């Protein structure tokens, strides 16, 4: 069964058309009208090996918040949809990723219980302007939106970092690598749900 999803979401604030394939090779085509976010979502697809096509637009004349948030919401929903009942996946994974002085660790549990903890970001990171009109605060907001709408537990911890671009990119790549292994089929439990209660 193909682990794919295609979701279109239209609101008065944004328009999102997102398609993904969990069993891809990391091919991406990303256009969100927010250049730095394009860069981050491209990295997320590339390093998770999720094929990802996104066409998004919104009221970026106000700010990038709505377009960024709604894209993350739809990505989370598509991830949840493509995973189905989660039979045969590894479920748990973690990844630690460096980018120069920045070092981020992501820990994922594809549990069906949404939770997100982000920690370690330096004071003032949330106010940093990265690549124009993408603020540091949006990184945490993206992580929370993905976690809650994919119904996964995500812990994101920044171990070290100074440059806002490097911090954001290390965190996105850490999430990507953790997702790659958490959603990967485990040949030792083919067809089984990785939970003692029999459902996720």
Swiss-Prot record:
* EC top class, as a word: lyase
Task: Copy the pathway line from the protein's UniProt record.
Answer: Amino-acid biosynthesis; L-histidine biosynthesis; L-histidine from 5-phospho-alpha-D-ribose 1-diphosphate: step 6/9
Reaction catalysed by this enzyme: D-erythro-1-(imidazol-4-yl)glycerol 3-phosphate = 3-(imidazol-4-yl)-2-oxopropyl phosphate + H2O
Molecular-function GO term, any one:
imidazoleglycerol-phosphate dehydratase activity
GO BP terms in the entry: L-histidine biosynthetic process
Magnesium listed as a keyword? no
The record's GO CC annotations read: cytoplasm
- Subcellular locations according to the entry: Cytoplasm
Pfam families, alphabetically? IGPD
**Keyword Lyase, does the record have it?**
yes
UniProt keyword list? Amino-acid biosynthesis, Cytoplasm, Histidine biosynthesis, Lyase
Enzyme Commission code: 4.2.1.19
Q: Which Gene3D superfamilies match?
A: Imidazole glycerol phosphate dehydratase, domain 1
Q: Member of which family?
A: Belongs to the imidazoleglycerol-phosphate dehydratase family.
Give the matching PANTHER family. Answer: IMIDAZOLEGLYCEROL-PHOSPHATE DEHYDRATASE (PTHR23133:SF2), IMIDAZOLEGLYCEROL-PHOSPHATE DEHYDRATASE HIS7 (PTHR23133)
Protein name as it appears in the record? Imidazoleglycerol-phosphate dehydratase
Q: Which organism is it from?
A: Bifidobacterium animalis subsp. lactis (strain AD011)
Q: Which taxonomic lineage does the organism of this UniProt entry have?
A: Bacteria, Bacillati, Actinomycetota, Actinomycetes, Bifidobacteriales
């Amino acid at each position: 069964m193909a682990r794919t999803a295609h979701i279109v979401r239209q609101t008065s604030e944004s328009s999102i058309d997102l398609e993904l394939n969990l069993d891809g090779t990391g091919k991406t085509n990303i256009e969100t009208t927010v250049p730095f976010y394009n860069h981050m979502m491209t990295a997320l697809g590339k390093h998770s090996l999720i094929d990802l096509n996104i066409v998004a637009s919104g009221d970026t004349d106000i700010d990038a918040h709505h377009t960024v948030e709604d894209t993350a919401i739809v990505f989370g929903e598509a991830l949840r949809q493509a995973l189905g009942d989660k039979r045969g996946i590894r479920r748990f994974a973690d990844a630690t990723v460096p980018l120069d002085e920045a070092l981020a660790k992501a820990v994922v549990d594809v549990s069906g219980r949404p939770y997100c903890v982000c920690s370690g970001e330096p004071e003032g990171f949330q106010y940093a302007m990265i690549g124009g009109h993408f603020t540091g605060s949006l990184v945490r907001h993206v992580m929370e939106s993905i976690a809650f709408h994919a119904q996964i537990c995500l812990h994101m911890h920044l171990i070290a970092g100074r440059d806002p671009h490097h911090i954001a990119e290390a965190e996105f790549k850490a999430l990507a690598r953790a997702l790659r292994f958490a959603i990967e089929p485990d040949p030792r439990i083919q067809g089984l749900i990785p939970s003692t209660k029999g459902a996720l």
